[in-house]
Amino acid sequence: MNPQELKSILSSGLLSFPVTDFNAQGDFHRAGYIKRLEWLAPYGASALFAAGGTGEFFSLAASEYSEIIKTAVDTCATSVPILAGVGGATRQAIEYAQEAERLGAKGLLLLPHYLTEASQDGVAAHVEAVCKSVKIGVVVYNRNVCRLTPTLLEQLAERCPNLIGYKDGLGDIELMVSIRRRLGDRFSYLGGLPTAEVYAAAYKALGVPVYSSAVFNFVPKLAMDFYHAIARDDHEAVGKYIDDFFLPYLEIRNRKAGYAVSIVKAGAKIAGYDAGPVRAPLTDLTPDECDMLAALMDKQGKQ
């Protein structure tokens, strides 16, 4: 799949990022991951991101990363395109990018580098180096320490033909509007704030109709139904979903830092697809919080 074909796929539909399965000892659980992918693939997501942020990329060893990406690519070979999360320091990100390409990933989600303070010129050089290390399409994730400006993105677009997507995890509306107006159709634009459904209608109005859904991991039917309501501008249905599910969900998610990942794993377990515990430094939901989530999920009906 060439980068422009990937861009076309990412320009419509719902995206998601499967959690990574661990066993009771915290090691990668391949059979559970295959079962998860086989469950989720038929629901109709346009693409899935393996080893992304919700897939705990930041906690994976290099050997595990290779097994996870290969498992995802092989399992979904005939059903849904797999993009691989990559990140870390530049040389590390390049190694991950080239490994994902070798294993057959259709594209990459370039996650922010971890912790290190850097100028945005330096971040742009990092993005350029990763893009030039592979031939497959790359989506850059503006979030946390990665805050690329319209000018820098325009320069990167000129230098890196395979940079085909921009994912926004900042929520800076002025910046998003500036990027969307400046770059036009050069990129596919993805909403990437945690629990992106809450912002989906607003982002669609800005020209960003596509987003990635975390809750697709455990209420896939609801996630797809909500996306279709957004796509057809059914504001009444959207409002009902937000009132009945997403706002109560946020009340649980916002209890602790890191719960944006932990609550998804808890939901997957309740749904019958236990992915095991999160890895430190993340912490799992408490039993009471799991009960609250289970009650909320039960109200949504069969998935």
Swiss-Prot record:
Keywords recorded for this protein, A-Z: Lyase
The record's EC number reads: 4.2.1.41
Instruction: Read off the Pfam families from this record.
Output: DHDPS
Give GO terms for biological process.
D-glucarate catabolic process
Superkingdom of origin: Bacteria
Q: Which GO terms describe its molecular function?
A: 4-hydroxy-tetrahydrodipicolinate synthase activity; 5-dehydro-4-deoxyglucarate dehydratase activity
Reactions catalysed according to its record: 5-dehydro-4-deoxy-D-glucarate + H(+) = 2,5-dioxopentanoate + CO2 + H2O
The main enzyme category here is lyase
Q: Which InterPro entries match?
A: Aldolase_TIM, DapA-like, Dehydro-deoxyglucarate_dehyd
Kindly give the Gene3D superfamilies that the UniProt entry links to this protein.
Aldolase class I
Query: Pathway membership of this protein?
Result: Carbohydrate acid metabolism; D-glucarate degradation; 2,5-dioxopentanoate from D-glucarate: step 2/2
List the PANTHER family.
5-DEHYDRO-4-DEOXYGLUCARATE DEHYDRATASE 2-RELATED, DIHYDRODIPICOLINATE SYNTHASE
Q: Which family does it belong to?
A: Belongs to the DapA family.
Question: Which NCBIfam families does the entry mention?
Answer: KdgD (TIGR03249), PRK03620.1 (NF002958)
* Protein name, UniProt field: Probable 5-dehydro-4-deoxyglucarate dehydratase
Q: State the species of origin.
A: Pseudomonas syringae pv. tomato (strain ATCC BAA-871 / DC3000)
- Taxon lineage: Bacteria, Pseudomonadati, Pseudomonadota, Gammaproteobacteria, Pseudomonadales
